[in-house]
Curated annotation (Swiss-Prot):
Domain PI3K-RBD, first and last residues per copy: 187-289
Site (Implicated in the recognition of ATP as well as PIP2. Also crucial for autophosphorylation of the p85alpha subunit): K776
Gene name per UniProt: PIK3CA
Family recorded in the similarity comment: Belongs to the PI3/PI4-kinase family.
Positions of the UniProt region annotated as Catalytic loop: 912-920
Effect of R88Q: In MCAP; also found in a glioblastoma multiforme sample
Segments forming domain PIK helical: 517-694
InterPro entries on file: ARM-type_fold (IPR016024), C2_domain_sf (IPR035892), Kinase-like_dom_sf (IPR011009), PI3/4_kinase_cat_dom (IPR000403), PI3/4_kinase_cat_sf (IPR036940), PI3/4_kinase_CS (IPR018936), PI3K-type_C2_dom (IPR002420), PI3K_ABD (IPR003113)
Region annotated G-loop, chain positions: 771-777
Function: Phosphoinositide-3-kinase (PI3K) phosphorylates phosphatidylinositol (PI) and its phosphorylated derivatives at position 3 of the inositol ring to produce 3-phosphoinositides. Uses ATP and PtdIns(4,5)P2 (phosphatidylinositol 4,5-bisphosphate) to generate phosphatidylinositol 3,4,5-trisphosphate (PIP3). PIP3 plays a key role by recruiting PH domain-containing proteins to the membrane, including AKT1 and PDPK1, activating signaling cascades involved in cell growth, survival, proliferation, motility and morphology. Participates in cellular signaling in response to various growth factors.
Protein name: Phosphatidylinositol 4,5-bisphosphate 3-kinase catalytic subunit alpha isoform
């Protein structure tokens, strides 16, 4: 169920001609051909059509034009009714220029909403109606309850609750101000400028207040009222009454954007205020009437769609209407019959035979040995073979899955056989109603992903490929006399108690008894220390079989070390119902763990629904909205590891998205950006549908963003395909001409920025827009900020639109850098990182925030003449900074450069960020250094002639050292350089203390399909750079050596930069 292709305004045509002939079929049977402008609205076309129709026979049979709407066939081969007649012809995405006039029937409002949802998702909602799978139908119905609850919650306290949804407070997770930030205050006080609009002409008045940083907004408003009324010479009693009367009638808004201080958080907990304190800027806030804000809020009306009233098509046993038996009363081993395969396309000359490889897995772990079919000729792939597995049916865990692949085998004379997977698939052994699968089944398989090293793909998606022209495997499961169900919790608890009492009756000295028996009553002090040591290990460190036995035998004591849970779960034998039942009872009463630890339980190693449910409950209890926003990319990705459509994680994220519009905004884009991926398009499409149904009026804002992005995709496709051989001047002329067209002006102006929904994008500043020189022809776009106080924040908003580059890796790297920055700030390290905005919005399409007043190192070096451009003059960068920051601000600029350079040295080293050259390292006018373009990480560095081009652990050239040491000749012998080194050492050790978090965040991204993040082996690079097998002292010594290599090997970086500069000059 893939989303629509972006094929232009008509099928296979990027842009309609300025005038186009449209054939219109009238209800009286007449076909009228109209010449229409491509930008014409439907209401204009209808008016012209009915004027023209009077010249044709049978016109008297027609009713008034207002009785009709247009209908046509779109590029998705769907029949669409066009209720919104303000839409333009060029935006209808017609298959052919043909319109039919009809009288509308059915529920008009629901049809309009379905169209809007379909446009936002990128596929018609009616496709979900046609899916016969009862799991899909039940999910669509049941998830509406979550939507209804969230909408009711938003309307709980009327206008204030709605305002909190639309403008959620943008606050830090903790009210505590780090010491180094507090030290920037004057005795704990901050100066705030309060602005008031005093006339209809937007005349402004300001009041400067000095207040305690931990004041709540109401106290700031009270102080502003006191200051405003000072000239009125009120008595203290009158003043008190005045404050009481007006204090609750106003709110504070950040000048220049749509951010409001609606809750009673300390002022310095609001991110805007904290940022101002850090940067030494004066916060500018606007005083506005609450009623003025409340009156602008849309009234959301949630109505249940018609499909909610349909009767479930689930089979009788799913509804509990037929006899069932427990899985645990079956007394046979698992077996599966492989029948035959179709659509297996192979080259008969290259391949001798094919066979089917199968395995029973729990997450990435096999529950028994894999089993293969016989080998057969690829011309006749039939087996009709029963495969027997070394596991009893009662021992199957709830998340067991059958993994299959059709494999080819090629044998060369005297050489080892070559086995290669041709296609793969996975099947859950229990369906969403806890029922064991049975009977015959046809499974359409998936193409083998890049980088798959094994013959099976156990952590891949379950279920059939929607593309029916792929290899298809027919198989058969055993039938039983009754429907077989996984036991419920009461049966599991009963079995666990029996299992524990049976264990207690054994004598530990009895020969041959397992060393996994519970031994909590004989726990020694060194055993406790060993358990504590295991609990602190990173998620990638291997647990030996002996350690697994040790953990399991002390499982009851483990409850006193809650964070050991992931390790204990890995020690469970998931092919033993005795152990699984006991583990379920332990998890049921396990103490909550921190959200960052709970997230580990959501990766591919922990597929069990009860375990994942425990993790979600920990997130519900302790994860703040700020932290949720921070980790949202990963939480969306691990939805792929959920067994079924309806699960606790889906419900948790959906509820959060529907009660916090900022979270909802990014939730929408993270899901939509993967709708081209067939493995998740159904799951993500259904979730997007439910979000769009209940997000209220924000759906219209999202559709404005989607429309703008589609226009830009179409434009850049033309530039890359039809105009690629034209000169820059001709391309620019085309761009400006297109953007001046009415439909482009409508679509590309006056919408919320996808990068930050608190920022409005006003009118396009066409004279400032340009096509960038790189191969994918990115667009540099510039919008006015329409906020009436824009001059106090920024007056224009610049964004780079990219079509053709996968920005997911950039987005992940910038997120990790942002988290590193937070860790450093909380530990008193102000390293001034600059994780600019970046958002992937589709298949190799995305947006990047332009950082103001910044220049690449190459641009700066080129300003230093030929010597500087060719890197021979290492003083160019220092001189440029000196010229930009004269007098007293020079020291501050050098300090800022030093701090940011230290931060990026540590971050790029730990993450193995490659392809570093003077075009992707930038410096702001005030001295702040930052990196851009993160196409290579985890040590996947560019190669030249088979060798890694970069030979140093991170970039620390002579140019940087000269700036850090304020121009000294012997840079590394200065006090400034020593201070820089100390910053790097502290920063490195601070991140090392949080190694588990970073490993978990990368592990959760394994399902993303990023080329450089394919396996745990890739993530192991972080273990290496953080030296997690060493003591802290040894790790620091290791990092010191890397740092030494960096500044002594700086000349190799310089050589790379020289060649990069020469290449860039040749291209330009």
């Amino acid at each position: 169920m893939p989303p629509r292709p972006s094929s232009g305004e008509l099928w296979g045509i990027h842009l309609m001609p300025p005038r186009i002939l449209v054939e219109c079929l009238l209800p009286n049977g007449m076909i009228v051909t109209l010449e229409c402008l491509r930008e014409a609205t439907l209401i204009t076309i209808k008016h012209e059509l009915f004027k023209e129709a009077r010249k044709y026979p049978l016109h008297q049979l027609l009713q008034d034009e207002s009785s009709y709407i247009f209908v046509s066939v779109t590029q998705e081969a769907e029949r669409e009714e066009f209720f919104d007649e303000t839409r333009r012809l060029c935006d209808l995405r017609l298959f052919q220029p043909f319109l039919k006039v009809i009288e509308p029937v059915g529920n008009r409002e629901e049809k309009i909403l379905n169209r809007e949802i379909g446009f936002a998702i990128g596929m018609p909602v009616c496709e979900f109606d046609m899916v016969k799978d009862p799991e899909v139908q039940d999910f669509r119905r049941n998830i509406l309850n979550v939507c209804k609850e969230a909408v009711d919650l938003r309307d709980l306290n009327s206008p204030h609750s709605r305002a909190m949804y639309v403008y959620p407070p943008n606050v830090e997770s903790s009210p505590e101000l780090p010491k180094h930030i507090y030290n920037k205050l004057d005795k704990g006080q901050i100066i705030v400028v309060i602005w008031v609009i005093v006339s209809p002409n937007n005349d402004k008045q300001k009041y400067t207040l000095k207040i305690n940083h931990d004041c709540v907004p109401e106290q700031v408003i009270a102080e502003a009222i006191r200051k405003k009324t000072r000239s009125m010479l009120l008595s203290s009693e009158q003043l008190k009454l005045c404050v009481l009367e007006y204090q609750g009638k106003y709110i504070l808004k950040v000048c220049g954007c749509d951010e409001y201080f609606l809750e009673k958080y300390p002022l310095s907990q609001y991110k805007y205020i904290r940022s101002c304190i850090m940067l030494g800027r004066m916060p500018n806030l606007m005083l506005m009437a609450k009623e003025s804000l409340y009156s602008q809020l849309p009234m959301d009306c949630f109505t249940m769609p018609s499909y909610s009233r349909r009767i479930s098509t689930a089979t009788p046993y799913m509804n509990g209407e037929t006899s069932t038996k427990s899985l645990w009363v079956i007394n046979s081993a698992l077996r599966i019959k492989i029948l035959c395969a179709t659509y297996v396309n192979v080259n008969i000359r290259d391949i001798d035979k094919i066979y089917v490889r199968t395995g029973i897995y729990h997450g990435g772990e096999p529950l028994c040995d894999n089993v293969n079919t016989q080998r057969v000729p690829c011309s006749n792939p039939r087996w009709n073979e029963w495969l027997n597995y070394d596991i009893y049916i009662p021992d199957l865990p709830r998340a067991a899955r059958l993994c299959l692949s059709i494999c080819s085998v090629k044998g060369r004379k005297g050489a080892k056989e070559e086995h290669c997977p041709l296609a793969w698939g996975n099947i859950n052994l229990f369906d969403y109603t806890d029922t064991l699968v049975s009977g015959k089944m046809a499974l359409n398989l998936w193409p083998v992903p890049h980088g798959l090293e094994d013959l099976l793909n156990p952590i891949g998606v379950t279920g059939s490929n929607p593309n029916k022209e792929t290899p298809c495997l027919e198989l058969e499961f055993d039938w039983f006399s009754s429907v077989v169900k996984f036991p419920d919790m009461s049966v599991i608890e009963e079995h666990a108690n029996w299992s524990v009492s049976r264990e207690a009756g054994f004598s530990y000295s009895h020969a041959g008894l397992s060393n996994r028996l519970a031994r909590d009553n004989e726990l020694r002090e060194n055993d406790k220390e060993q358990l504590k040591a295991i609990s602190t290990r990173d998620p990638l460190s291997e647990i030996t079989e002996q350690e697994k036995d040790f953990l399991w035998s002390h499982r009851h004591y483990c409850v006193t070390i809650p964070e050991i849970l992931p390790k204990l779960l890995l020690s469970v034998k998931w092919n033993s119902r005795d152990e699984v039942a006991q583990m379920y009872c332990l998890v049921k009463d396990w103490p909550p763990i921190k959200p960052e630890q709970a997230m580990e339980l959501l990766d591919c190693n922990y597929p069990d629904p009860m375990v994942r449910g425990f993790a979600v409950r920990c997130l519900e209890k302790y994860l703040t909205d700020d932290k949720l926003s921070q980790y949202l990319i990963q939480l969306v990705q691990v939805l792929k590891y959920e067994q079924y459509l309806d699960n606790l994680l889906v419900r948790f994220l959906l509820k959060k998205a529907l009660t916090n519009q900022r979270i909802g905004h990014f939730f929408f884009w993270h899901l939509k950006s993967e709708m081209h991926n067939k493995t998740v398009s159904q799951r993500f499409g259904l979730l997007l549908e439910s979000y769009c149904r209940a997000c209220g009026m924000y759906l219209k804002h999202l559709n404005r963003q989607v429309e703008a992005m589609e226009k830009l995709i179409n434009l850049t496709d033309i530039l890359k395909q039809e105009k690629k051989d034209e000169t820059q001047k001709v391309q620019m002329k085309f761009l400006v001409e297109q953007m001046r067209r009415p439909d482009f002006m409508d679509a590309l102006q006056g919408f919320l920025s996808p990068l930050n929904p608190a920022h409005q994008l006003g009118n396009l500043r066409l004279e400032e827009c340009r096509i960038m020189s790189s191969a994918k022809r990115p667009l540099w776009l510039n919008w006015e900020n329409p906020d009436i106080m824009s001059e106090l924040l920024f007056q224009n908003n610049e964004i780079i639109f990219k079509n053709g580059d996968d920005l997911r890796q950039d987005m992940l790297t910038l997120q990790i850098i942002r988290i590193m920055e937070n860790i450093w700030q909380n530990q008193g390290l102000d390293l001034r990182m600059l994780p600019y905005g970046c958002l992937s919005i589709g298949d190799c399409v995305g947006l990047i925030e332009v950082v103001r007043n910044s220049h690449t190192i190459m641009q700066i070096q080129c300003k230093g003449g030929l010597k500087g451009a060719l890197q021979f003059n290492s003083h160019t960068l220092h001189q440029w900074l000196k010229d930009k920051n004269k007098g007293e601000i020079y020291d501050a600029a050098i300090d800022l450069f030093t701090r940011s350079c230290a931060g990026y040295c540590v971050a790029t080293f730990i993450l193995g960020i490659g392809d570093r050259h003077n075009s992707n390292i930038m410096v702001k006018d005030d001295g702040q250094l930052f990196h851009i373009d993160f196409g290579h990480f985890l040590d996947h560095k560019k190669k030249k002639f088979g060798y890694k081009r970069e030979r140093v652990p991170f970039v620390l050239t002579q140019d940087f050292l000269i700036v850090i040491s304020k121009g000294a000749q012997e840079c590394t012998k200065t006090r400034e350089f020593e201070r820089f080194q100390e910053m790097c050492y502290k920063a490195y050790l601070a991140i090392r203390q949080h190694a588990n978090l970073f490993i978990n965040l990368f592990s959760m991204m394994l399902g993303s399909g990023m080329p450089e993040l394919q396996s745990f082996d890739d993530i192991a690079y972080i273990r290496k750079t953080l030296a997690l097998d060493k003591t802290e002292q040894e790790a620091l010594e290791y990092f010191m050596k890397q740092m030494n290599d960096a500044h002594h090997g700086g000349w190799t970086t310089k050589m790379d930069w020289i060649f990069h500069t020469i290449k860039q000059h040749a291209l330009n």
